[in-house]
Amino acid sequence: MKNKALMLAPLIIFLVLCVFLLKGLFGNPKEIETGRIGHSMPEFNLPDLMQDGKRWTEKDLLGEVYLLNVWGTWCPTCLIELPYLTKLRGQGVKIIGLYYEQGYDSDFGDVFDINALRVEVSGMLAKTGDPYQFNILDLKRTLALDLGVSGAPEHFLVDKNGTIILHHTGDINERVWRAKFAPKLSELN
């Protein structure tokens, strides 16, 4: 009896692994859930990317519906979606940038040059259009981690009370906006 159970153990382990692998293989990577939908924005106190001395907290964002766009200049998909996001801003959508710095890690002795980043961001936004009311700098990725961000771009639709209503991984284009965001935004306004 013991031998039979020992012989079945590898088969059971194999079957469990197959289920997980198949789920990952056939799952939609755009449907990665953050776990924060229906919850408040995490607490944060982070600097403005472009303005020295200015800091933002989750409380500063209460009272208006907004789209939080996690992005970076290093992200080619972010570059592609900026003109469409700029069009949305022109239609009255409040978009706040969360600049996700991928290349910096103080644990490895990296030195961060805010002025160089500001020049890079300004140049990029001058070419593509600037959809942002303002940009929050998340240098150590603390807010991004609290939100469950896995990369960029990612988007969070947040209501007037600071509750996350919708999360989307990947770029926002007209199709995505109409299918996912526009209906939710209509409900909130």
Give the ranges of each region predicted by the language model.
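N-terminal targeting signals for export/organelle localization
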Residues: M1-P47, N189
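A short beta-strand-turn-helix
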Residues: N45-Y66
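Short pre-active-site segment immediately N-terminal to redox-active cysteine/selenocysteine motifs
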Residues: E64-Y66, V70-W74, G151
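Hydrophobic beta-strand anchors of alpha/beta hydrolase catalytic cores
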Residues: L67-L68, I95, H155
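Conserved redox-active cysteine motifs that mediate thiol-disulfide chemistry
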Residues: V70-K87
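Thiol-/selenol-based redox modules, centered on thioredoxin-like
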Residues: G92, E154-N189
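Short, flexible/disordered intra-domain loops and linkers
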Residues: G103-A116
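Short, internal strand/loop/helix patches
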Residues: D113-V158
